[in-house]
Design a protein with these regions (language model features):
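Active-site beta-strand-loop-beta-strand hairpin of nuclease catalytic cores
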Residues: 58-71, 87-89
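Short secondary-structure subsegments characteristic of cysteine-rich extracellular domains
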Residues: 83-99
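Short beta-strand-loop-alpha-helix junction that forms the active-site gateway
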Residues: 73-83
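Domain-level recognition of nuclease-like catalytic cores that cleave nucleotide substrates
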Residues: 101-107
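Short His-Asn-centered micro-motif
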Residues: 50, 73-75, 96-98
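Short, well-ordered alpha-helical microsegments
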Residues: 56, 79-81, 102
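Structural alpha-beta junctions
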Residues: 42-44, 92, 107
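Acidic-basic catalytic patches of nuclease active cores, encompassing PD-(D/E)XK
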Residues: 2-53, 60-63
């Protein structure tokens, strides 16, 4: 008989991402940042700053003949933005893996 403890049940692998640079779905914010970095060309973005303080990232998006500054906060779950009490006015995009904040402010 095989015995399983509670840890065995919580250590299951996340979903497989077919054709993505990360084999499995992210389990944390760093995985979100990694996947986002592979979307830069498609989103027409260049990164200016990545930092540990809010906002996590300053990027520029090609728009017409110019560039638009985009302030980005990375979260694994969108609701983490609220629990960290960030000011929504200091951020243009919340990039997350799981959107679980139904009353997200519309700024």
């Amino acid at each position: 008989m095989i015995s399983m403890d509670k840890k065995d049940l919580t250590d299951r692998r996340p979903d497989i991402l077919e054709g993505a640079p990360l084999h499995y779905a992210p389990k944390n914010e760093l995985g979100v940042v990694f996947l986002f970095s592979h979307m830069l060309k498609k989103l027409r973005l260049t990164i200016d700053i990545i930092q540990p303080q809010y906002p996590d990232c300053i990027a520029y998006q090609k728009v017409g003949g110019g560039q638009k500054k985009i302030r980005i906060e990375f979260e694994f779950k969108s609701r983490n933005f609220k629990s960290q009490r960030h000011n929504p006015k200091g951020c243009d995009w919340i990039v997350c893996w799981e959107h679980n904040w139904p009353d997200i402010p519309n700024t």
